[in-house]
């Protein structure tokens, strides 16, 4: 019941805290507006009331938290007092540990604890604790827990005869040592271990080496072009061989109407034919007299 009450009060306090914060915000926003003096005074009074209520709520929170803390400390103190009352007032002397008991007054006596002797092995050693009473101090011997972890034992090696015998539904004979009933029930398992699987590796295909041909372009020599030199034209030697002067008379009476004297220049070609292109008249050469040998009557 107390827990539910505390939860309810906490929820109500949270709600009031939130509402008061909202009211403060709203009042501050309204105060910033240019209202009349009366409205501003009322808003300021509301803000003061809300701020005081917030302070009260915070005090309630702190008080409830302190109450919870005091409750827990009181419970712990009650538990410790009950443990002290239930403990034995005195114990017999233990000769193995060599513990001596002495009655001491409350002013001089202080609770002392002897630490437990811990060995590297996993064996547990007793640990002594002292409890303070009004006039005497008593010790309790409590077995201490082993500090070191126990090593896990390795499983025993299985015999070679039974290979994974827990799978089978029958009892292998390797287990039966001297039990006749076991020998009557058991069955012998052959000593054949599963052989190693022969793994055939895939044969690699022979790699055909392809030699790259030289893809160089074949250099063909250009055909020799016959260069014909221009033949020299034969030089025509023109020589004056025969100069014929002809004197033509139209009538035998001695009245020359037209006299003409032709002078032909014959050029000697390689064939020997005279070239008729060169014809000279006597009018062109007036200074040369006609020769008597070439005249015809």
UniProtKB/Swiss-Prot annotation:
Residues 211-232 have a biased composition (Basic and acidic residues). Pfam families: Glycoprotein_G (PF00802). Belongs to the pneumoviruses glycoprotein G family. Residues 187-198 are annotated as: Binding to host heparan sulfate. Residues 103-161, 190-297 are annotated as: Disordered. InterPro entries: G_prot. One of its GO terms (biological process) is symbiont entry into host cell. Residues 67-297 are extracellular. The keyword Oxidoreductase does not apply. The lineage of its organism: Viruses, Riboviria, Orthornavirae, Negarnaviricota, Haploviricotina. This is Major surface glycoprotein G. Keywords: Disulfide bond, Glycoprotein, Host cell membrane, Host membrane, Host-virus interaction, Membrane, Secreted, Transmembrane, Transmembrane helix, Viral attachment to host cell, Viral immunoevasion, Virion, Virus entry into host cell. The chain crosses the membrane at residues 38-66. The gene is G. One of its GO terms (cellular component) is virion membrane. Residues 105-147, 235-253 have a biased composition (Low complexity). Residues 190-207 have a biased composition (Basic residues). Disulfide bonds join 173-186, 176-182. Residues 254-285 have a biased composition (Polar residues). Residues 1-37 are cytoplasmic. Residues 287-297 have a biased composition (Pro residues). The keyword GTP-binding does not apply. Glycans are attached at residues 70, 72, 80, 85-87, 92, 100, 103, 105, 113, 119, 135, 137-139, 144, 147, 199, 203, 219, 231, 235, 237, 251, 253, 269, 275, 282-283, 287, 294. The record marks 65-66 as: Cleavage.
